[in-house]
Amino acid sequence: MIIFWKGENDLSENFDRIRISLASPEQIRSWSSGEVKKPETINYRTLRPEKEGLFCEKIFGPVKDWECHCGKYKRVRHKGIVCDRCGVEVTTSKVRRERMGHIELAAPVCHIWYLKGIPSRMGLLLDMSPKVLEKVIYFVSYIVLDPGDTPLLKKQLLNEREYRENRDRYGEAFKAGIGAEAVKSLLYEVELDKMSSDLKEEIATTTGQRKSRAIKRLEVVESFRLSGNDPMWMILDVLPVIPPDLRPMVQLDGGRFATSDLNDLYRRVINRNNRLKRLLDLGAPDIIVRNEKRMLQEAVDALVDNGRRGRPVTGPGNRPLKSLSDMLKGKQGRFRQNLLGKRVDYSGRSVIVVGPNLKMHQCGLPKEMALELFKPFVMKKLVDKAIASNIKSAKKMVERGREEVWDILDDVIKEHPVLLNRAPTLHRLGIQAFEPVLVEGRALQLHPLVCTAYNADFDGDQMAVHVPLSAEAQTEARLLMLASNNILNPKDGKPVVTPTQDMVIGLYYLTFISAEAFSKENPRAFSSTDEARMAFELGQIDLHEKIRVKMSVPQKTGREILKSHEAQTFLEEIVDTSVGRIIFNDAIPTSLGFYNEIIDKKKLGNIVYECYRLEGNARTADMLDSLKSLGYEFSTRAGITVGVTDFETPLAKYDILQEADQEVEAIERDYEVGLITDEERHAQVVEIWNQATDDVTEVLKNSLSEDNPVYMMATSGARGNFQQIRQLAGMRGLMADPSGKIIDLPIKANFREGLTVLEYFISTHGARKGLADTALRTADSGYLTRRLVDVSQDVIVREDDCESVEGIWVGRIMEGSQLIEPLHQRIIGRVSVDTVIHPDTGEILVEENQMIDDDIGYEIERAGIEKVKIRSVLTCKTRHGVCKKCYGRNLATGYNVEIGEAVGILAAQSIGEPGTQLTMRTFHTGGVAGDDITRGLPRVEELFEVRKPKGQAVVVEVNGKVRFGENKGRREVEVLGENGEVLGTYPVHYGSRLKFEEGTEVEIGDALTEGPLNPHDILKTKGLQEVQRYLLQEVQKVYRSQGVDISDKHIEIMIRQMLKKVKIEDPGDTSLLPGAFVDISSFEDENNREIRAGGLPATCSPMLLGITKASLNTDSFLSAASFQETTKVLTEAAIKGKIDHLIGLKENVIIGKLIPAGTGYSAYRETSISEAPESENMVSD
């Protein structure tokens, strides 16, 4: 049952929270419009609903609008009249979607959710095991309700024989019952207040198993006590019947009927109920009545949750029928199928083709599709312009495709953006807005530069089009979603729109000058760039020829301007360059400086980023369009192709192979003599062949000329890399077998020479594994994204500053002597906690609570500062979200984050989207111990779900000295105190590698052996901040190994959500329950309230929950129920009478309200806009 709290005006839209609880029999009757007495559905001759049946018009309302069953009243003028002949109210047929009925049950039945759920709520309340309860409810055993003065015990079970014997012996001196009625009378006797105080006492005085059971029981008792639910309501006397239009029956072509499974299940219940009534009226023997009651119980079970107990009821073809619970569960259930995502009008889909002539903000929309999508707009315009007299004739004109219609359509789509979406939508750039341009044909045209964001190509991909209708929707699409406004990638703040493939090769070719040409002594000279271009157009000079030009040269690079904030300066100089480079520099703003170098993909990315930071969105979009046109033009002119003759195998390859073969032979001889083990032999052979492969690649690289098309493709970053060229013209190298172990027999041939049969066979393992992995990875990555979104969907920027004084220390990341991530990358776009001062000059580099922008970031790094304390979401004090200061810069815009930004979803998408690129499965390193190292996607999942890692390290829980020993054939490590006493003993496998020598000092939380750490151990031994640091570092490690950049703040948001709950250890005088998981903020509130009242506060310990568990433990039951384990979540919520305050996004999507993010955020909704009064003095002469 759901209650809405309404605001002052009585609109159901105006509620701000929603409550779910158990329904009492009176409530069920009050919802109902009448009792369903017959199992009939519709009459097979008249095809009208049967009276008092499951589709009865008297109960549920008329089948046809404004028409009663007998036909006495037809037409809308009789609205509201109840027909005196058939009793049907004259109203719209829509009421058949909302009017409910009910069935009066002849015997009480138990609701299976509360009996069979885990834990069994009924069992905990009555202190009986679910098995025992089941025996009573399904008429196997009697239960003693009141022993009277007999030696029987209350709640003792008696089988049929024992019951008869005791009846014969004691007569009516004791009371016993069977079935749901007996359980109902036991529930009637439950005194919640008394039970609550008894259990609290028991918890205080007992330990171990009894205490934990008492805690579980107390939780259920408190749920009932505080929610006002009566435990007797878990037993049903009345069964609600859902509206008929939600369980429809439709006629198929062949005259047969298709019906919802629910009708079959309801029919079984009604049949059995009516039969039971008849048997009771006839006074049938007890055994027959009991059997009928049991069957009624089973029929209601099947209706509520088919298959929860025993074999499910099946329909035709042995298919289990879908019960009410199944209607809610899973991907096809009500939550995920209809509430969280719906199919929408004003949408279409088609194949995409490239639109190389489009501007960045445009897309090509096929004429037919546009006409259909914008039909209502076109019709209105036709009537407005008096081309058509009314809407009906306008519709005819549109359908016939008359001349005038196309002109109007052109008019209508001007400046009306449409949204393009490509599935799978892995991040927010999977839906962007474009202005439509009408095109012939039936394919959508897509701008080539947005392909990266959509991950689209033109090999048959399809995309969907959606039309934003309202003025607000169009404005949002234009301002926030227009493709030219989405140049940066939200996951790392780098440009996602950079020229690719043909464009890159074109620009590389354009700016290319060979080393030979560049060393030419006295090139031709020109007095201006225009003169040089003229000479080029007249064929006097070549595109790549070195020339000398007098020109006005920008003196600063884009980066220098960004740092100094000064304007660009120019000087007349004579420059050695080429016509190609002059043409290239004409396409980019002068503020970026003059690029006199060969341009590859990486440099293009930098140019786009600098242009965005210096010149803003619009100018960057223009520049990208010019670069696109230039790139395509010159890649066409270059005509760069790949032919088999472009791959020449270097002769030195054969010498390298011969040398390697000799080395391997020597190792094999050592192995045969027994000097080395097989593992050592394998490792050395692999090492030799890897070196040989690298040597061949090096020789190959040097043998390719600079203007070799393949070399140009690889070096420019247009397509391919040297690994692929190595396989085509060098050697394929070593391959792995299906288990991932490297085969020590290399493939010496390349594809140009062709492989032998054995070589081909060896290489098929990898190819097959690659395909299988890709398929598995996609599904796993999608599921990970779904869990991440669910755990973080309610994290929204809610305030300007939470005034937290805490933060986290960050420094550069090194691995050995190699720099992995410099300091500036980690601090740019974050807010500093303290004032940072230059160690040498004493100058203030950044004030406290000031944003660290690009130049301050570089400045701090140059000053030699190693660590900076920054504000972080991990230490943010804002409730249900984060504050602007702790979050910092919004990476998608490069500016400060706005209030109302849904940063949780942004973070989930940023982590989930690259998931498909991560490798799968474990790798066998084939080292000495042959460890299985979990890497890639499974490792990320393991970290976010905080599972116990495979081959985890043993962690010390005390300080002391290490001593090795053995005990019963097991290796042990003992930690000794100062006086030599043993403080802790840790069993260690013989296979694991130890990190410490005997006698070394160890501290709490140190790992004794190699291997990944268990995050729970870190939390226990080293505390909260250390586990946050570890999780962040480990997740980043996996992504970095695949070359994926993700900003720390996204991962921090997830870690914060995982650490949001605490476990109550001792409740003190608060109303909290021991062992309960509570939000940190709720815990603090309760304690503050208790301290103010002079009571004893509660104590807690921090909890680290995996993302699935954290999602299910969210305060919102709607969000949790729509995620997983729907029935379990709803059972719990109903008993507790939970209130959902509709704080997150999912809850609001489910009930159909605006989401509280972006312009739907309350702070923005409550602003009112009024026209400024026109004052007279504003009008001037």
UniProtKB/Swiss-Prot annotation:
Annotated catalysed reactions: RNA(n) + a ribonucleoside 5'-triphosphate = RNA(n+1) + diphosphate
Cofactor: Mg(2+); Zn(2+)
Residues annotated for Zn(2+) 1 binding in this entry: 68, 70, 83, 86
Cofactor note: Binds 1 Mg(2+) ion per subunit.
Tree of life domain: Bacteria
Keywords: DNA-directed RNA polymerase, Magnesium, Metal-binding, Nucleotidyltransferase, Transcription, Transferase, Zinc
EC number: 2.7.7.6
GO terms for biological process, alphabetical: DNA-templated transcription
GO CC term, one of those recorded: DNA-directed RNA polymerase complex
Family, similarity comment: Belongs to the RNA polymerase beta' chain family.
Alphabetized HAMAP family for the sequence: RNApol_bact_RpoC
Chain's role: DNA-dependent RNA polymerase catalyzes the transcription of DNA into RNA using the four ribonucleoside triphosphates as substrates.
Assembly information from the UniProt record: The RNAP catalytic core consists of 2 alpha, 1 beta, 1 beta' and 1 omega subunit. When a sigma factor is associated with the core the holoenzyme is formed, which can initiate transcription.
Name listed for the protein in its UniProt record: DNA-directed RNA polymerase subunit beta'
Gene name tied to this protein: rpoC
